[in-house]
């Protein structure tokens, strides 16, 4: 019988970013209680030796599973050190991988209060409107001019510590393009 390979997307992440993610998740699960329905699985509870942790985030009937890995093949840079993250959406027997932006939007829809574009309509109808968004990472696009005007009137309150963003966890802060020097040291 032949070997059958299964390929999955694993985002290379440095270990300090993974530590920050884990501590933010635990803080909002146990201290602030904003993520009290989330489930954190430690490395010693996982049957796979490369999984360092799993966070199960219920989304209605489905759930989002964010797995962190260690001991993977090292990346191009020394600081990658074989750490990684995979993000999976599961519903019953079906599962698929999602990108960090979509994961943040899904988390935002289910868990955190938001002052969204629907707030304009609610305010006109005289309904009570949430005056700020607790989870800015869940917004991937620029809002309408009305939305931007209303958000300019109400300054967003900084939440300490910040809410755990999957996009921020997988962000590549090391490989930003560098400015090169051209003729006689002038930056191009």
Curated annotation (Swiss-Prot):
Residues spanned by motif BC-box-like motif: 144-153
Span list, region Interaction with host APOBEC3F: 14-17, 74-79
GO molecular function list: metal ion binding; RNA binding
Domain of life: Viruses
Complexes and interactors: Homomultimer; in vitro and presumably in vivo. Interacts with viral RNA and Pr55Gag precursor; these interactions mediate Vif incorporation into the virion. Interacts with the viral reverse transcriptase. Forms cullin-5-RING E3 ubiquitin-protein ligase complex (ECS complex) by interacting with host CUL5, RBX2, elongin BC complex (ELOB and ELOC) and CBFB/CBF-beta. Within the ECS complex, Vif interacts directly with host CUL5, ELOC and APOBEC (APOBEC3F and APOBEC3G) substrates.
Annotated site residues (Cleavage in virion (by viral protease)) in this chain: 150-151
Recorded GO CC terms: host cell cytoplasm; host cell plasma membrane; membrane; virion component
Positions occupied by motif HCCH motif: 108-139
InterPro entries linked: Vif (IPR000475)
GO biological processes: viral life cycle
Pfam families: Vif
Note on domains (UniProt): The BC-like-box motif mediates the interaction with elongin BC complex. The HCCH motif (H-x(5)-C-x(18)-C-x(5)-H) mediates the interaction with CUL5.
Biased composition regions of type Basic residues, renumbered to the chain: 176-188
Function text: Counteracts the innate antiviral activity of host APOBEC3F and APOBEC3G by promoting their ubiquitination and degradation. Acts as a substrate recognition component of an E3 ubiquitin-protein ligase complex: mechanistically, Vif hijacks a host cullin-5-RING E3 ubiquitin-protein ligase complex (ECS complex) and the transcription coactivator CBFB/CBF-beta to form an active E3 ubiquitin-protein ligase complex that targets APOBEC3G and APOBEC3F for polyubiquitination, leading to their degradation by the proteasome.
Multimerization, as annotated region: 151-164
Name used for this protein in its record: Virion infectivity factor
Ranges where the record places region Interaction with host APOBEC3G: 40-44
Region (Interaction with host APOBEC3F and APOBEC3G) residue spans: 54-72
Subcellular location: Host cytoplasm; Host cell membrane; Virion
SOCS box-like, as annotated region: 151-180
Annotated positions binding Zn(2+): 108, 114, 133, 139
């Amino acid at each position: 019988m032949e070997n059958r390979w299964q390929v999955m997307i694993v985002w290379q992440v440095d270990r300090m970013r993974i530590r920050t993610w884990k501590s933010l998740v635990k803080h909002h699960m146990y201290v602030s209680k904003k993520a009290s329905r989330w489930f954190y699985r430690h490395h010693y509870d996982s049957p796979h030796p490369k999984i360092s942790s799993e966070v199960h985030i219920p989304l209605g009937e489905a759930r989002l599973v964010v797995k962190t890995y260690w001991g993977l093949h090292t990346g191009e840079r020394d600081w990658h050190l074989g750490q990684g993250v995979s993000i999976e959406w599961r519903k019953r027997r079906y599962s698929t991988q999602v990108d960090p932006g979509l994961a943040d939007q899904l988390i935002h829809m289910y868990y955190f209060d938001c002052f969204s574009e629907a707030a304009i309509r609610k305010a006109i109808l005289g309904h009570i409107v949430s005056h700020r968004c607790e989870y800015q990472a869940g917004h991937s696009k620029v809002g309408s001019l009305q939305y931007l005007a209303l958000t300019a009137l109400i300054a967003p309150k900084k939440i300490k510590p910040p809410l755990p963003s999957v996009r921020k966890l997988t962000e590549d802060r090391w490989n930003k393009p560098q400015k090169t020097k051209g003729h006689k040291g002038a930056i191009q």
